[in-house]
């Protein structure tokens, strides 16, 4: 079976950032990891960057990119349609205390190359 990754990216209101990180790490990810077909979850935070190309070191504009990204490795796209997934994303404080304060939300599903 092919593996897939779901990439979920978003920003959070600054006054809710500590709660966002706490809930994501202690409630949201553990709930998602209990969903059949979910293999792994990793979180990332964007950083400013410079890159050398065209013979020059340049500042890269990442201002439109969401601050936080989570990468969910899953068995297949059908995992995202299960009742278990639906239940997991509504668990704990996420739906009422965190989700309303997120913005610039982006989701993309990618099939891993074999």
Task: Locate the predicted segments by residue.
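Macromolecular interaction modules
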Residues: 1-114
């Amino acid at each position: 079976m092919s593996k897939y990754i779901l990439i979920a990216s978003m920003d959070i209101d600054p006054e809710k950032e500590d709660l966002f990180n706490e809930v994501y790490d202690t409630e949201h990810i553990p709930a998602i990891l209990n969903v059949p077909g979910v293999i792994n979850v990793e979180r990332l935070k964007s950083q400013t960057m410079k890159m050398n190309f065209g013979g020059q070191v340049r500042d890269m504009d990442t201002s439109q990119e969401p601050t936080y990204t989570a990468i969910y490795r899953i068995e297949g796209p059908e995992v995202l349609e299960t009742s278990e997934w639906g239940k997991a994303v509504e668990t704990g404080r996420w739906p009422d205390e965190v989700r309303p304060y997120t913005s610039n939300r982006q989701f993309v599903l990618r099939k891993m190359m074999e």
